[in-house]
Regions:
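P-loop NTP-binding module
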Residues: 1-226
């Protein structure tokens, strides 16, 4: 066994005492990223009452409603890890089926996993509603970035919930399908994908059957949750 001990000592001298990530035991805990300090991102603190009124899972300690989104998170994270995905779209066949609430609460559930930061983008440019889910009035967002060149740093909002940030939809536009399929939107998605390696991107998209927006945007995402 001496040769094994000698080999181990030689490995430590060459590489340090830490075992490479690929040789960690499968059950070893993943490293937790340091906490994020939001300096340039606008922060809005939500009260517990607001979170409960808006049916955000962070306003409840438990129950079937919260558990359902945690189960969905487990399935989504599993698929993302297996396939190397980090860009998800959330849609519904028709309006008023709860897609925005699903996108918001899935994003919050994902942000509870300390291995990830989550950015939710309101890409329903015909009927933006993510800001309403946080009890906020209309505010500039994706539209202003694409058409008015407002920097993202001035548009992102951190609602005081963990490692979660969202980009509002901004003002309503008529040519939303063209905007989502535009080269500028493609550049934005690529930038957001690569700016933070541990970040998951979630896009709240328009209903699938009522507009052409989703079909033009699908090439930019890894998976679509219907």
């Amino acid at each position: 066994m001496d040769y094994l001990q000698q080999g181990l000592e030689r490995f430590k001298q060459e590489h340090g005492s830490e075992v490479p990530p690929q040789r960690r035991q499968a059950g070893a805990p993943r490293p937790v990223p340091p906490p994020i300090v939001y300096t340039s991102t606008k922060t809005v603190e939500l009260t517990d009452e607001t979170m409960r009124t808006q049916r955000l899972i962070t306003g409840f300690e438990g129950g079937a409603f919260v558990d359902a989104f945690k189960m969905l998170r487990t399935q989504v994270v599993k698929q993302c890890r297996q396939n190397g995905w980090n860009v998800l779209g959330v849609t519904s066949p028709t309006p008023h089926e709860g897609k925005t609430l699903t996108a918001v609460n899935l994003s919050l559930a994902l942000a509870m996993d300390l291995a990830h930061t989550v950015l939710l983008v309101d890409a329903d440019m015909h009927r933006p509603a993510v800001h309403q889910a946080f009890g906020m009035d209309s505010c500039p967002g994706l539209t202003e970035h694409l058409f008015d060149e407002v920097p993202l740093e001035q548009l992102l909002i951190h609602p005081g919930i963990g490692r979660f940030v969202f980009l509002p939809g901004g003002r309503v536009i008529a040519n939303s399908a063209e905007a989502l399929a535009s080269p500028k939107m493609a550049v934005l998605v690529e930038e957001l994908k690569h700016r933070y390696p541990a970040r998951l991107l979630v896009f709240d998209l328009p209903p699938l059957l009522s507009r052409a927006d989703v079909l033009g945007f699908v090439p930019h995402i890894d998976a679509l949750l219907l």
